[in-house]
Amino acid sequence: MTELISIKDSSKHVDQEVKMHVWLTDKRSSGKIIFLQLRDGTAFFQGVVRKNDVTDEVFEVAKSLRQESSFYITGTVHEDARSHFGYEIQITDLKVVSNNEGYPIGNKEHGIDFLLDHRHLWLRSKKPFAIMQIRNTMFKATVDFFEKEDFIKFDAPIFMHSAPEGTTQLFHVDYFDHDAYLSQSGQLYGEAGAMAFGKIFTFGPTFRAEESKGRRHMTEFWMMEPEMAWMHQDESLDLQERYLAYMVKQVLDKNEYELKILGRDPEKLRPTTEGNFVRLPYDDAVKMLQDAGRDFKWGDDFGAPDEGYISEQYDRPVFIVNYPTSIKPFYMKKNPDNPKEYLCADVIAPEGYGEIFGGSEREGNYEVLEQQIIDAGLNLEDYQWYLDLRKFGGVPHSGFGMGFERTIAWVCHLDHIREAIPFPRLINRMQP
């Protein structure tokens, strides 16, 4: 019996007759030969229909196929050194499932607004396909890494009574007779999980009502947020470095084909897999910018151009450590050697991509945290449960958050974060 296979498994079936179910992405003909560009969700490759190898009926059906028609094929797999994929199939039989005309995304240049309007169909094209395959590898690498490190997956709520970083940039929701907000972060609940299970990570959607059209901002995006009991900041930085190195190595090992589709040079990513990330104090980063003639003073937060400049000085991610307390959230622990600083760090991706991780050692002292909540102008009652984590068995603990789409954008070398998620939600876009 002829085996049904996927395109990605073609290398295991060279010179064998196989069956596949596929979609047509493009077609061209040279008289007695029809070249079909095919996809099946696992890869893209070429099918060849020769008039002398098929019945007249099959050849006429092949001639009639339109873009994104779907059909079953039978044929023999051969090597094809000319293609990115390396294989093609000589088709001997073909049965159509659907063959409608008018597919809106033709094989020509389209503007980004048109493509986003048709995102439900654009996902079928090569570039989105490659990005989503890499996204999937990075997701699986994340779960694999943290399982090996004895973390458990911990789910935080989406509806929040209060926000971990104040009440700005929040989506308000009418929650029966109460006010609620869409989550900006699962961190505070993750800390509760860490006190119960030791090491946890949350992974889910977060929401920020940022009125920004910048290339690094969306209103809905995914965050991966580990929290670790009994862990200090330096240990957390070591963990972050191992994790990022592991995740990028998985992409290099498993997504060579997709990186080729994107034109992404894998050698630009390889230094990250070696670790040894520089730990650059905030003070030194300020001096770096000032020495470069930039208008930046101590106490300012880094903007995207500042982070971009810093990242371009390194061939791998860099930690910027110990920011001023005035520009970071209330839950961080102050540096005992300099109370004007928090024990915190942001990971800045190379090649101008800027911040992708942010983390800190968390303040573990009840009285100190209580005062920091008050100083931040927050309602103490909203955070009483959070203070209980310190009151009852509080321990030193640390955590960080990774912006998943920002990290994907860097790995894939994308111009805009909107391409790193299947259906982007932007200030001016909620459909499809």
UniProtKB/Swiss-Prot annotation:
CDD domains: AsnRS_cyto_like_N, AsxRS_core. It is an enzyme of class 6 (ligase). The keyword Protein biosynthesis applies. It comes from the Bacteria. Keywords: Aminoacyl-tRNA synthetase, ATP-binding, Cytoplasm, Ligase, Nucleotide-binding, Protein biosynthesis. One of its GO terms (molecular function) is transferase activity. Its EC number is 6.1.1.22. It catalyses: tRNA(Asn) + L-asparagine + ATP = L-asparaginyl-tRNA(Asn) + AMP + diphosphate + H(+). GO terms for cellular component: cytoplasm. GO terms for biological process: asparaginyl-tRNA aminoacylation. PROSITE patterns: AA_TRNA_LIGASE_II. Gene3D superfamilies: Bira Bifunctional Protein, Domain 2 (3.30.930.10), Nucleic acid-binding proteins (2.40.50.140). It is found in: Cytoplasm. The keyword Electron transport does not apply. Homodimer. Belongs to the class-II aminoacyl-tRNA synthetase family. HAMAP family: Asn_tRNA_synth (MF_00534). This is Asparagine--tRNA ligase. The lineage of its organism: Bacteria, Bacillati, Bacillota, Bacilli, Lactobacillales.
